[in-house]
Structures are given as structure tokens and as C-alpha cells.
Amino acid sequence: MGVSVFSQVWKVSDVYRLRADLGDASRPVLHRSAPWSEDVSALYVDSLINGFPLSPMVVQSCRDAQGRGVLRLLDGWQRVEAVVAFAEDRLRLPAGFVFRGETWGGETVEAGGMTLSQVRERYPYVARRFDTALIPVAHVKGDDDMLGECVSRLHGEMA
């Protein structure tokens, strides 16, 4: 059996909602590295806000114990956690954060070290960039062996 992959983009709100649906039992099937540090998580949020290219999260449609259709996260748990932590004010922007978008009246954005709530209050247009950031998602279908190979290939890890 082959693998079929289709690409999607999700907003931050989609990822936030997905986090609650996944639960602890659905952590990614591939663990490529140690958990992200706070600095790496903050840099991911910085990249979201500033529109830098991002690796896709990888999901699979499946059924839960009750037979409901759910998504299983195959790769990208740390990205989900970074989004959720920033949305819940448990993560701050990097100290050297530079906003690479347009500002109101050319003002300088000094949001380094701020939580999302602080950014919303002082720089609402920066917070809006986080809220509307598009996150790439690869939705794959196939058996578990093929799915593992698919994710490995997405990350350049040839067997």
C-alpha cells in the first residue's frame, strides 16, 4: 500500500483546538529529538509571527476508542506545545525579537521578552500576526510502516 499526502495550512486557533483533541495518548509516533528548550520554542513563535518558512506538522486521520474520527499527530508535538504555551502566556518572545512587518506610524516594536497578553496590549498588530499565522500541515494516509517512512523522508532521514 502506498502513502497519499495532501497539504493544508492551519491557523493558530486550529492548532490550539487540535491540542485539546489529541490528549496525552496521542503524542507523536516519531520522537526525533529531545524536547525543545524555551529558547527554541520562542524562536518558533517568532518565526510564525514573522512569516519564516516552517516544517509541516504531520497528521493522520484515525478512529478513537469510541469510533469517532480524530487526528493523530505523527510529528510536530513540540510545535503544538510552543503555540499553546505562547497562547496561554507560559512562553515569552525571544529577548532579541525583531518584528519584520509593517508597524503603525513606523513605531519601533520592542516586544522581546513579552507574553502574548502583553503583546496584545502594546502591539495588537503583532498579536494579530500570531493569531493569523498559517502553519503548514501534511495530512498523510497509509499503513504505519509507510507513515513512518513518509515522516522520515519529510525530514531528510533516509534509511
How does the language model describe each region?
Residues G2-W10, V29-A159:
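Basic- and aromatic-enriched surface patches that contact anionic nucleotides/nucleic acids
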Residues V15-Y16:
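N-terminal intrinsically disordered, low-complexity segments enriched in P/E/S/T
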Residues D21-L30:
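A short, surface-exposed helix-loop junction/capping segment
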